[in-house]
């Protein structure tokens, strides 16, 4: 059975998972945030097979998450996060935060570079500053929201 593509799905979550939903792609992006730039660095830090790494890097470049940057004075290139790729930082940190809450050791603490203090956990906040739990929120059709906002 052929795998269904969600590349053009209406749902932004489905489209996002189509782009970065496999484990290797997410870990490659994580390593790019950690400073890996060269093929060999990704290969070594992740322990991933070359053929898998090649396919995932090509996909991330094609999606505009990574870009190939020439290495000055060399025929080689490096991989760098694009603006679109850097936008995944919040997503990765949210997944990390969820994983921390599921138990197990946490070898790293996320800190503010300026003062080295731990960063507050991610949370959703209402327009008035209240922290919102999952049961405090709902998705409504954008068209319905627009009509309701115009009536106010």
Model segments located where?
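A detector for short, charged/polar N-terminal pre-domain segments
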Residues: 1-7
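N-terminal helix-turn-helix DNA-binding core of bacterial DNA-binding proteins
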Residues: 11-49
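Alpha-helical linker/hinge and terminal dimerization helices associated
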Residues: 16, 26, 63, 91-102
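Basic, amphipathic "hinge/linker" alpha-helix immediately C-terminal to the N-terminal HTH DNA-binding motif
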Residues: 21, 72-92
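Canonical helix-turn-helix DNA-binding module
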Residues: 39, 43-68, 75
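C-terminal regulatory/oligomerization modules of transcriptional regulators
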Residues: 93, 97-152
């Amino acid at each position: 059975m052929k795998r269904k593509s969600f590349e053009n799905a209406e749902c932004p979550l489905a489209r996002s998972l189509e782009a970065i939903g496999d484990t290797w792609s997410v870990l490659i992006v994580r390593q790019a945030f950690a400073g890996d730039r060269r093929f060999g660095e990704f290969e070594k830090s992740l322990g991933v097979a070359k053929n898998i790494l090649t396919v995932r890097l090509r996909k991330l470049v094609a999606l505009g998450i990574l870009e190939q940057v020439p290495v000055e004075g060399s025929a080689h290139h490096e991989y760098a996060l694009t603006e679109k790729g850097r936008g995944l930082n919040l997503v990765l940190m949210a997944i990390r935060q969820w994983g921390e809450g599921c138990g197990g050791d946490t070898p790293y603490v996320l800190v503010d570079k300026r003062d080295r203090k731990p960063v507050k956990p991610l949370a959703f906040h209402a327009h008035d500053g209240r922290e919102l739990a999952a049961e405090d929120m709902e998705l409504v059709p954008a068209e319905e929201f627009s009509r309701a906002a115009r009536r106010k």
